[in-house]
């Protein structure tokens, strides 16, 4: 696909990104160009995983990575694709000390036609720029970064697995690289992208539901915070709570918020409730994007699909544990599930809340909606159903 055509596609897909804290001039920047991309191919390619070898998430990496450096005096340097290697960072690096760091996660899929396609990458570019502006890290041109990522995948296209449920996970990262212990806007930054082949979240297409610990004493995000940005600092503090959940026999954490115990997220996933609302109407509900919720790409995709079907009400609104408990007691809950790039759609069958186990009848109900979502997403992602959500590599 020519650069001109890609530019037309991206101009249509990419959205303007406002951010009230980063007024013009606060984040000195230039735009790196994909046309200036330098490519250094490795002389020591790694052995690729065998088709029968399990692909554990984040354990195997491809031969190359993308690197772009920035400083406040000259702006962005030329982007380069280089052999995968360790980073050299100053011990006072601000990204290490003060979590001036953000990341993204998206996937490329190889279809039966052997074509590699990225799933809705424009949404990831939008979110990544929003996160960068929240940390006052340098702006970048979303279109140019996406083209650099596309070319990186093209270089390592033989690493894209083609087994059932497999994909190539793409991890862009932007860190402040200030060699100083002061807290403030950085004068140096580093953007890099690494790739890793991953297997299916549910091996063998089995669908294992998860149990959740819902403890209001733990809070993931709050109004006025950064819960709607994909920052490394949002994830580290969840590890201890995840361990607490496992001690109590639960696989994941249901994050609650406020005195009314609003449902917000499941682990690192968005949450959905498919039920008959108390007004008698069949509804798919998910928390609104009010600054607490990460605007997930799969979340948006499920909402878009459901609204296209037009078979039930789709609501972005607050759902409380009181509402959920009452609906369970009245037999109105059909399915509860999480959504995210790693799992796509993950069923929930149990919630431990206030010392009591609440059974969720997700699996007893098919789960019809989850299976329908998964089938539709897979058809789009692997190219069996043509869709403008996919960007061909």
From Swiss-Prot:
Gene Ontology biological-process entries: branched-chain amino acid catabolic process; branched-chain amino acid metabolic process; cellular response to leukemia inhibitory factor; isoleucine catabolic process; isoleucine metabolic process; L-leucine biosynthetic process; L-leucine metabolic process; L-valine biosynthetic process
Tissue: Expressed in all tissues.
Catalytic function, reaction form: L-leucine + 2-oxoglutarate = 4-methyl-2-oxopentanoate + L-glutamate; L-isoleucine + 2-oxoglutarate = (S)-3-methyl-2-oxopentanoate + L-glutamate; L-valine + 2-oxoglutarate = 3-methyl-2-oxobutanoate + L-glutamate
Subcellular location, record wording: Mitochondrion
Domain of life: Eukaryota
Keywords: Acetylation, Amino-acid biosynthesis, Aminotransferase, Branched-chain amino acid biosynthesis, Lipid metabolism, Mitochondrion, Pyridoxal phosphate, Transferase, Transit peptide
Keyword Glycoprotein (UniProt): no
Necessary cofactors: pyridoxal 5'-phosphate
Binding site for substrate: 169
Assigned EC number: 2.6.1.42
PROSITE patterns in the record: AA_TRANSFER_CLASS_4
Modified residues (N6-acetyllysine): 322
A GO-annotated cellular component: mitochondrion
Entry annotated with the keyword Amino-acid biosynthesis: yes
GO molecular function annotations of the record: branched-chain-amino-acid transaminase activity; L-isoleucine-2-oxoglutarate transaminase activity; L-leucine-2-oxoglutarate transaminase activity; L-valine-2-oxoglutarate transaminase activity
Cross-referenced Pfam families: Aminotran_4 (PF01063)
CDD domains from the UniProt entry: BCAT_beta_family
Homology family: Belongs to the class-IV pyridoxal-phosphate-dependent aminotransferase family.
Free-text function comment from the UniProt entry: Catalyzes the first reaction in the catabolism of the essential branched chain amino acids leucine, isoleucine, and valine. May also function as a transporter of branched chain alpha-keto acids.
Quaternary structure (record): Homodimer.
PANTHER family per record: BRANCHED-CHAIN-AMINO-ACID AMINOTRANSFERASE, MITOCHONDRIAL, SUBGROUP IIII AMINOTRANSFERASE
UniProt name for this protein: Branched-chain-amino-acid aminotransferase, mitochondrial
């Amino acid at each position: 696909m020519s650069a001109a055509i890609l530019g037309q596609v991206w101009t249509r897909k990419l959205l303007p990104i406002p951010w009230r804290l980063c007024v013009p001039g606060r984040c000195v920047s230039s735009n790196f160009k994909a046309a200036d991309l330098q490519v250094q191919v490795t002389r020591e390619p790694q052995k690729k995983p065998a088709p029968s070898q399990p692909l554990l998430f984040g354990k195997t990496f491809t031969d190359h990575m993308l690197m772009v450096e920035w400083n406040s005096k000259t702006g962005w340097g030329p982007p380069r694709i280089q052999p995968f290697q360790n980073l050299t960072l100053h011990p006072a690096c601000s990204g290490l000390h003060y979590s001036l760091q953000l990341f993204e996660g998206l996937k490329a899929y190889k279809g039966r036609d052997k074509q590699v396609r990225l799933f809705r990458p424009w949404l990831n570019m939008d979110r990544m720029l929003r996160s960068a502006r929240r940390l006052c890290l340098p702006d970048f041109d979303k279109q140019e970064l996406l083209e650099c990522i596309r070319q990186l995948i093209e270089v390592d296209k033989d690493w894209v697995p083609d087994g059932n449920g497999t994909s190539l996970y793409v991890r862009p990262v932007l860190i402040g690289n200030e060699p100083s212990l002061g807290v403030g806007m950085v004068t140096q930054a580093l953007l890099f992208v690494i790739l890793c082949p991953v297997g299916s979240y549910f091996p063998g297409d089995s669908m294992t539901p998860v149990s959740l610990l819902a403890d209001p004493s733990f809070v993931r995000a709050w109004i006025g915070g950064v819960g709607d940005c994909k920052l490394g600092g949002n994830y580290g503090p969840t590890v201890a709570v995840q361990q607490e959940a496992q001690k109590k026999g639960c696989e994941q954490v249901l994050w609650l918020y406020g005195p009314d115990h609003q449902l917000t997220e499941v682990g690192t996933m968005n949450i959905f409730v498919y039920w008959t609302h108390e007004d008698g109407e069949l509804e798919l509900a998910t928390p609104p994007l009010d600054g607490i919720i990460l605007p997930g790409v799969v979340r948006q995709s499920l909402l878009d699909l459901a609204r296209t079907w037009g078979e039930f009400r789709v609501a972005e609104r607050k759902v409380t544990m009181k509402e959920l408990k009452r609906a369970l007691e009245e037999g109105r809950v059909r399915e509860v599930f999480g959504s995210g790039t790693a799992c796509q759609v993950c069923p929930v069958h149990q919630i431990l809340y206030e010392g009591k186990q609440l059974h969720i009848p997700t699996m007893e109900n098919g789960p019809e909606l989850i299976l329908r979502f998964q089938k539709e997403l897979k058809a789009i992602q692997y190219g069996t159903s043509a869709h403008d959500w996919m960007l061909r590599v």
